[in-house]
Amino acid sequence: ANRRAYDYVVAGMRSSVIKGTCKSANRSDYLVCGKTGTAQNRGQDHSVFMGFAPMNSPKIAIAVYVENGGFGADYGVPIGALMMEQYIKGKLSPSSEKRAEEFQKRHIAYGSRNR
């Protein structure tokens, strides 16, 4: 594959984190690259996020797929961001710990619209 094409993809994924649908994954201590997706379904859409970090020296690449989770930014991005933080930092910050607890309490109504 062409290095220039790779650089364009990385720049696009970084842009999505800075000013697009992946904003909630943005961090000041390491650069995250990612892309959301919404897989349409007869019921609630599926939430998808793929990303990697740090941008210039990746240590983790992740794909998150939440069945009936809605838009990619609804569940995929926040869950993926928490997983990357845990892997890279070895633990979650207190605010991320709180966010993880909130996500564990959420209920997804499979097969129905719940937005």
Please place each PLM-identified region on the residue numbering.
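Active-site beta-strand/loop architecture of penicillin-binding DD-peptidases
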Residues: R3-P94
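Short, gly/Ser/Thr-rich active-site loops of penicillin-recognizing serine hydrolases
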Residues: I79-R115
